[in-house]
Design a protein with these regions (language model features):
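Subtilisin-like serine protease catalytic core
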Residues: 1-24, 37-43, 74-76, 103-107, ...
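Active-site-adjacent substrate-recognition loops and nearby beta-strands
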Residues: 25-29, 52-60, 82-105, 111-134, ...
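Short beta-strand segments within Ig-like beta-sandwich modules, predominantly Fibronectin type-III
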Residues: 286-289
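C-terminal subdomain of the subtilisin-like protease fold in secreted/lumenal serine endopeptidases
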Residues: 41-45, 177-267
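Solvent-exposed loop/turn segments flanking beta-strands in beta-repeat/beta-sandwich domains
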Residues: 268-281
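Short strand-turn-strand beta-turns centered on an Asx-Gly dipeptide
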Residues: 140, 281-283
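Structural recognition of the beta-strand scaffold that forms the well-ordered cores
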Residues: 3-4, 10-15, 40-47, 71-73, ...
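Hydrolase catalytic cores
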Residues: 1, 12-18, 50, 139-217
Length: 289
């Protein structure tokens, strides 16, 4: 009846919620690490969070379960975490409301968009309490049809960053399908480079206050911007590990403007010559060489 972002993905339900405590969640995350190779675990997604409905003073990424989520990424598993639903339109308490473990350093923290692609009023904003910009990206999380736990086969409409986060995990699964060797670092770099940049709209409403004092991108509302699944998948599939471009300041000063790039091309028939070569450094624009 309803189709998710990655309908061919295999799911593993790790029970770490919600009658227990944070230690149960951490044990579930550790189980994913320990069984990564056995079950081929590429992605972990979690929509858990510590909800305080107030400005945080301890969401600095150093809590035990935030560090555990960093360990999941360090084990080579792409990880998406919910930003939290604590904004609520509060002028003062709206900023610095990222939930733990969404304040972790290495995972991708996901904000929520409404169906009209506006930032959801409830979606938690940064900074973290150690002044890092969060979230990292925003996806649709409002009015999402999801299985109804109260029925055997029914569906119900749900809203929250808890809905946006598994959507981002589904997009990640498509990226892994395009490139089975995709690393968490590459995943995050693609988000930084290819998200659709969004402007912060205040709309004369204190509920849309600007939590980004200095940043333009990433910002504390959308992160790097709105997720672009097509661009993400295309970028993941185009990563060529035979191409190695490296440069340091001393070398650049020595050679001036005479720079050389060595690599391999593909897709052309034997005997054909390339008509154009383009180079992109980091998340910058493609430039013709």
């Amino acid at each position: 009846r309803y189709v998710g972002a990655a309908p061919g993905a295999h799911l593993i339900n790790i029970l770490g919620c919600c009658d227990g405590d944070i230690e149960d969640v951490m044990q579930g995350a550790q189980w994913a690490i320990d069984n990564k190779e056995k079950y081929g675990i590429d992605i972990v997604t979690s929509s858990l969070g510590e909800q305080q409905f107030e400005v945080h003073i301890d969401n600095d990424g150093n809590s035990a379960w935030s560090r555990q989520m960093d360990m999941v990424v360090e084990a080579g598993i792409i990880t998406t975490l919910s930003a939290g639903n604590e904004f609520g339109g509060a002028t003062l308490a709206g900023c610095n409301t990222i939930d733990s473990p969404g304040d972790a350093q290495l995972p991708v923290t996901v904000a929520s968009l409404d169906k009209d692609l506006g930032l959801a009023i409830y979606s938690s904003r940064g900074y973290t309490s150690d002044f890092r910009v969060k979230p990292d990206v925003a996806t649709i999380g409002s009015s999402i049809m999801a299985p109804d736990a109260a029925t055997q086969d029914g569906y119900t409409s749900k809203s929250g960053t808890s809905m946006a986060t598994p959507l981002m995990a589904g997009i990640a699964a498509l990226m892994v399908q395009a490139n089975p060797d995709l690393t968490p670092t590459e995943f995050k770099s693609i988000i930084a480079a290819d998200s659709i940049e969004r402007d912060i709209q205040l709309l004369d409403d204190p509920g849309f206050n600007d939590c980004s004092i200095l940043e333009s991108r990433p910002d504390n509302e959308f992160g790097y911007g709105q997720a672009d699944p097509t661009a993400f998948v295309e970028s993941a599939g185009s990563i060529d590990r035979s191409l190695n471009v490296s440069m340091d300041i001393e070398t650049m000063q020595g050679i001036g403007n005479e720079s050389y790039v060595h690599g391999q091309s593909s897709g052309a028939s034997l005997g054909q010559s390339a008509t154009r070569v383009e180079i992109r450094v980091g998340g910058g624009d493609w430039k013709e060489a």
